[in-house]
Amino acid sequence: MNEERLFEILLAPHISEKGALTTGQYVFEVMPDATKPEIKRAVEKQFNVTVKSVRTCNVKGKTTRFRQVRGRRKNWKKAYVMLAPGSEIDIAAGE
């Protein structure tokens, strides 16, 4: 596994209070070709935490319209990361 790729896999956090506060689950937007083991290693390396499980889903882009012009948002991949008990990520600080 290339170390540089680990830092490119996580694109952005998808912040939701419900997931983080109640279940210790964090949601990230990830690269569409990222696999679960890659996502797990990327989160563990960047945030120095222990990951319990990773679930992923592909989100279809919405069809949009501006007057007569139709467009489409891009498809993207979402990863649900469950941390081990006692682990926590401070998304606002980025650590």
Swiss-Prot record:
GO molecular-function term, one example from the UniProt record: structural constituent of ribosome
InterPro entries: Nucleotide-bd_a/b_plait_sf (IPR012677), Ribosomal_uL23-like (IPR013025), Ribosomal_uL23/eL15/eS24_sf (IPR012678)
Source taxon at top rank: Bacteria
Alphabetical UniProt keywords: Ribonucleoprotein, Ribosomal protein, RNA-binding, rRNA-binding
GO BP annotations listed: translation
SUPFAM superfamilies: Ribosomal proteins S24e, L23 and L15e
One GO term describing the cellular component: cytosolic large ribosomal subunit
Free-text function comment from the UniProt entry: One of the early assembly proteins it binds 23S rRNA. One of the proteins that surrounds the polypeptide exit tunnel on the outside of the ribosome. Forms the main docking site for trigger factor binding to the ribosome.
Complex and partners: Part of the 50S ribosomal subunit. Contacts protein L29, and trigger factor when it is bound to the ribosome.
Membership in a protein family: Belongs to the universal ribosomal protein uL23 family.
HAMAP family: Ribosomal_uL23_B (MF_01369_B)
Name the record gives this protein: Large ribosomal subunit protein uL23
